[in-house]
């Protein structure tokens, strides 16, 4: 194996000089023995000429110095895949960080792989029921599709994702991969213990677990956060290629972009709009195109997307939009009214909300709900200035129903039971459609609107109304 030496260190970016005849390829993994710090892995990003390569460190570069010997492995970063990864927490390099011994994998895959070709891809469309009323009604998910949860800080992306993991992963009993990209370590910890309680992680017999976890948290260097999503995706691809249906949860895709921004300037690239890397669209495309279903199995991905300053036109969320089949937009305005989940039914969209896919009845009910809410939104200014009395009878009725619908779109979550004390409710799609159909038809006009708050199907509302 060829050896070189470090010639420059700037934060997470390290330049290494090799003999001219043995320069490493782009994406090759290099190893540095940093004595007391252990072995550090570098990933080649650029060849600068003169035998010098520019690399990103997959760990902290503290303790490195010029002149240290670097070894070329002649291979890209490879991570464990297969059954051995289930029930384990790993870092970007696939090393265990849960203090439960070695992974003991039978096979390793390189994290950089080609996306499946057109011939291999599957184009079947079937619905994935989530048990969350507003999602199943307004922005239904596709099995094998890509779903984005968009929202600013503190409006409930992670809680919604946890509920989806609880409802889909536990109900659908398939395998899941959870990639924590640049999120809080506490959330990763909470998730691990919740999965143990739910029986999804089995510590006695890890091979019976249903989820593999890969974490590159907020405190990690940018190299880890930039590559950890690829590590999780590689593990999911292996399960898919074995003919399984996999769920891939990524929290948060924005931090993946941000890590690219952090190293982009150090790699000598000119920043583009808002300081993002010029390769933003390409980096996002490389990741998203690999998340796809083939004829052998499917990957359904749910990605949380942080929206900086609640601005959906920011280049990072705007680039992500283009790749998704369903977008769930969380609204700070709805959250401020105390209506949770704070999903905006007018902003959220889905490719699956099509009469040919969900059926004419579902489509009509969803559009009916949206048009009522839109009418209420238009009338809000008039109500604020002149009051309800100035509205026509039709408009008064529309406002009354819209307010009931707004409240009926709320729902107690299983994962929020700890803070709210209300037991979570899973609402089947047929119950959701039946309930909203009755609401639109005016069957429940005589029921007070507070009875609609935090209920499951319409039977719960009628039960609650009796107690009021």
UniProtKB/Swiss-Prot annotation:
Its main location: membrane. ATP binds at residues 151-158. The keyword Metal-binding does not apply. InterPro entries: AAA+_ATPase (IPR003593), ATP-synt_VA_C (IPR055190), ATP_synth_F1_bsu (IPR005722), ATPase_a/bsu_AS (IPR020003), ATPase_alpha/beta_chains (IPR050053), ATPase_F1/V1/A1_a/bsu_N (IPR004100), ATPase_F1/V1/A1_a/bsu_N_sf (IPR036121), ATPase_F1/V1/A1_a/bsu_nucl-bd (IPR000194). Pfam families: ATP-synt_ab, ATP-synt_ab_N, ATP-synt_VA_C. Its EC number is 7.1.2.2. Keywords: ATP synthesis, ATP-binding, Cell inner membrane, Cell membrane, CF(1), Hydrogen ion transport, Ion transport, Membrane, Nucleotide-binding, Translocase, Transport. It catalyses: ATP + H2O + 4 H(+)(in) = ADP + phosphate + 5 H(+)(out). It comes from the Bacteria. It is a peripheral membrane protein. One of its GO terms (cellular component) is plasma membrane. GO terms for molecular function: ATP binding; ATP hydrolysis activity; proton-transporting ATP synthase activity, rotational mechanism. It is found in: Cell inner membrane. The keyword Nucleotide-binding applies. F-type ATPases have 2 components, CF(1) - the catalytic core - and CF(0) - the membrane proton channel. CF(1) has five subunits: alpha(3), beta(3), gamma(1), delta(1), epsilon(1). CF(0) has three main subunits: a(1), b(2) and c(9-12). The alpha and beta chains form an alternating ring which encloses part of the gamma chain. CF(1) is attached to CF(0) by a central stalk formed by the gamma and epsilon chains, while a peripheral stalk is formed by the delta and b chains. Belongs to the ATPase alpha/beta chains family. Produces ATP from ADP in the presence of a proton gradient across the membrane. The catalytic sites are hosted primarily by the beta subunits. This is ATP synthase subunit beta 1. It comes from Photobacterium profundum (strain SS9).
């Amino acid at each position: 194996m060829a050896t070189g030496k470090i010639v420059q260190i700037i934060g997470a970016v390290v330049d290494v000089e090799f003999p001219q005849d043995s320069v490493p390829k782009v994406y090759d993994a290099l190893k540095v023995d940093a004595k007391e710090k252990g072995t550090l892995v570098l990933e080649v990003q650029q060849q600068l000429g003169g035998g010098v390569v520019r690399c990103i460190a997959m760990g902290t570069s503290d303790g490195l110095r010029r002149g240290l010997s670097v070894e070329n492995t002649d291979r890209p970063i490879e991570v464990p895949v297969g059954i051995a990864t289930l029930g384990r927490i790993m870092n970007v390099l696939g090393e265990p960080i849960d203090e439960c011994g070695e992974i003991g994998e039978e096979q390793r895959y390189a994290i950089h792989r080609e996306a499946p070709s057109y011939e291999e891809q599957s184009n079947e469309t079937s619905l994935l029921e989530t048990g969350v009323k507003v999602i199943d009604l307004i922005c239904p998910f596709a099995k094998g599709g890509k779903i984005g949860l968009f929202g600013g800080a503190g409006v409930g992306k992670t809680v919604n994702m946890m509920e989806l993991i609880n409802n889909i992963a536990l109900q659908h009993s398939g395998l899941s991969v959870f990639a924590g990209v640049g999120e809080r370590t506490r959330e990763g910890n909470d998730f691990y213990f919740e999965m143990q309680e739910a029986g999804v992680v089995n510590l006695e017999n890890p091979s019976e677990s249903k989820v593999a976890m890969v974490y590159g948290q907020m405190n990690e260097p940018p190299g880890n956060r930039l590559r950890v999503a690829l590590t999780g995706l590689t593990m999911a691809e292996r399960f898919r290629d074995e003919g399984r249906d996999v769920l891939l949860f990524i929290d948060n895709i924005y931090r993946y972009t941000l890590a690219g921004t952090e190293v982009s300037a150090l790699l000598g690239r000119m920043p583009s709009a808002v300081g993002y890397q010029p390769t933003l669209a390409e980096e996002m495309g490389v990741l998203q195109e690999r998340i796809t279903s083939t004829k052998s199995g499917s990957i359904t991905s749910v990605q949380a997307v942080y929206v900086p300053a609640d601005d959906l036109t920011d280049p990072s969320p705007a680039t992500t939009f283009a790749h998704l089949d369903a977008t769930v937009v969380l609204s700070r305005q709805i959250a401020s009214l105390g209506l949770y989940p704070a999903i905006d039914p007018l902003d959220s969209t889905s490719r699956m909300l099509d009469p040919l896919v969900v059926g004419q009845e579902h489509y009509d009910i969803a559009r009916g709900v949206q048009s009522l809410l839109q009418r209420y939104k238009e009338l809000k200014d008039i109500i604020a200035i002149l009051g309800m009395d100035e509205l026509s009878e039709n408009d008064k009725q529309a406002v009354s129903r819209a307010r009931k619908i707004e409240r009926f779109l709320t729902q107690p979550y299983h994962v929020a039971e700890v803070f709210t004390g209300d037991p979570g409710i899973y609402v089947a799609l047929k119950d959701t459609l039946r309930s909203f159909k009755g609401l639109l038809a005016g069957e429940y006009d005589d029921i007070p609107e507070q009875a609609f708050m935090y209920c499951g199907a319409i039977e719960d509302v009628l039960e609650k109304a009796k107690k009021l």
